[in-house]
Amino acid sequence: MLRTTLAPLVLALALALPAAAATPESWPTFGTQGTQFVRDGKPYQLLSGAIHFQRIPRAYWKDRLQKARALGLNTVETYVFWNLVEPQQGQFDFSGNNDVAAFVKEAAAQGLNVILRPGPYACAEWEAGGYPAWLFGKGNIRVRSRDPRFLAASQAYLDALAKQVQPLLNHNGGPIIAVQVENEYGSYADDHAYMADNRAMYVKAGFDKALLFTSDGADMLANGTLPDTLAVVNFAPGEAKSAFDKLIKFRPDQPRMVGEYWAGWFDHWGKPHAATDARQQAEEFEWILRQGHSANLYMFIGGTSFGFMNGANFQNNPSDHYAPQTTSYDYDAILDEAGHPTPKFALMRDAIARVTGVQPPALPAPITTTTLPATPLRESASLWDNLPTPIAIDTPQPMEQFGQDYGYILYRTTITGPRKGPLYLGDVRDVARVYVDQRPVGSVERRLQQVSLEVEIPAGQHTLDVLVENSGRINYGTRMADGRAGLVDPVLLDSQQLTGWQAFPLPMRTPDSIRGWTGKAVQGPAFHRGTLRIGTPTDTYLDMRAFGKGFAWANGVNLGRHWNIGPQTALYLRPSSARVTTRWWSSTWTMLHPSVRG
């Protein structure tokens, strides 16, 4: 979805706002008093917008926060995605785009309160709802449960996070005014002992003096809330009155807030781009504010699920199926993926101003964008020439068993023909391409509810390869409890189990080790690269319509997945990935043309 006007390219792969910005050390006190929030003891209405800082290039945090102020907001809400800050168990990374403390300080510098949502479960259309992949390699561990292994891992994460943000909590003079416990648990289960465990983990980590809260759908409040803990409600446009009626009936003596007012929606691969009614949302949002309720716009800006961080939906009803989300988290939000105001911006800004009577600050200067010339990809390298040392296994195992988190994995065995019949792969996680002697014979997609394909093996010995991509672990619904990726079932050919396999983990962490580059055409799964001089680094999109399915790097940074089934056709190139000389790599299973567009 190309949200900025850019030509195609050819590529290688209180009701009032705070009067002035306060410093964290002098931030006003915040709390609750009966049915009202209070700031320095005075009634205060939260006007909030969601910004997932890990989805926004750090260089643009200030710009997005200034635009939140320009909308008329006084607060921002953000998740912290556990899988980014603890990619390997016990190895925490709060640097760069994971620097939550720096984001909070920048919000404070712009005069904005911060609502922090650490999870550990986030949902957010994010890979596994934020759970790190290494969790799913621990046997039959049960996430979102009282499994001691899960609770211990969650506690370690919260302890590490608390050290980063302790000085920024409101009771320490900082702008973090509220901290969420878990996330929409009522839509998942109703184990109140588990929720109590979560609250206890927050207290133990050092959030004991913070204003803790839960958020749930209006019909799930009884399942996901805790006594003596603030409850907020989440809902879609058109549901405001009924949702608040239910919240007030459930908790009549507490402040009234919508924790997520869904001012947009997310996209799935192979489905149309979400387009929602901006005018209806602005009118309903104004109604919410006129009732004196507090509100959080979800999303103010969606941003991008860079790398392999998009999630997937799969609920547990008979009509549902696995549905991976796109790399772009545009969300049809107030700002588009690249931070440009959409038509919703003016409508929401005017609605807020009519209620508050306050004229918000002006928007910052527009972001500079660039149109790049067509650039051919002159070099290619076959995946078959870039396989790692194989691991011998009797039957296929999920990638977590090999210490792998994301990317692809190849399974290989030898078959003696002639053979013909259905090749059963089972519950593929998530897309499998099948090759006989490195020639493609078909695919099996979880998204399409496929479990097998017909194959014909000629006489003699032949190599069977099954290349599996993890397209995004489930982030919502009960099926997220099993987050394994790759092949998880025995492979059968005409009902006979195939044994004696090799596994080749392909996490695709960097293009630096790719070998066998050639200027000749390469068939099958391959890498393609080219170099482009772009001058001063600015925003642009890479038009990937010339490719089939794959992902792209720019100067070693994984920009995310592309897929010609849409609706997303272009990848956002953040300026930190663009240099005067930029080298593009694209890894594809199929390429439609010998050149690409950007």
Swiss-Prot record:
Q: Which GO terms describe its biological process?
A: carbohydrate metabolic process
Q: What is this protein called?
A: Beta-galactosidase
Q: Which keywords belong to this entry?
A: Glycosidase, Hydrolase, Signal
Q: What is the pH dependence described in this protein's record?
A: Optimum pH is 4.5.
Gene3D superfamilies the record matches: Galactose-binding domain-like, Glycosidases
Signal peptide boundaries: 1-21
**Where is the catalytic site?**
E184 (proton donor), E260 (nucleophile)
Gene that encodes the chain:
bga
Tell me which domain of life the UniProt entry assigns to the organism this sequence originates from. Bacteria
InterPro entries in the record, alphabetically? Answer: B-gal_1-like, BetaGal1-like_ABD1, BetaGal_gal-bd, Galactose-bd-like_sf, Gly_Hdrlase_35_cat, Glyco_hydro_35_CS, Glycoside_Hdrlase_35, Glycoside_hydrolase_SF
Q: What does this protein do?
A: Preferentially hydrolyzes beta(1->3) galactosyl linkages over beta(1->4) linkages.
**For this protein, what is any one GO molecular function term?**
beta-galactosidase activity
Name the Enzyme Commission number(s) assigned to this protein: 3.2.1.23
Catalytic reactions of this protein: Hydrolysis of terminal non-reducing beta-D-galactose residues in beta-D-galactosides
Q: Which family does it belong to?
A: Belongs to the glycosyl hydrolase 35 family.
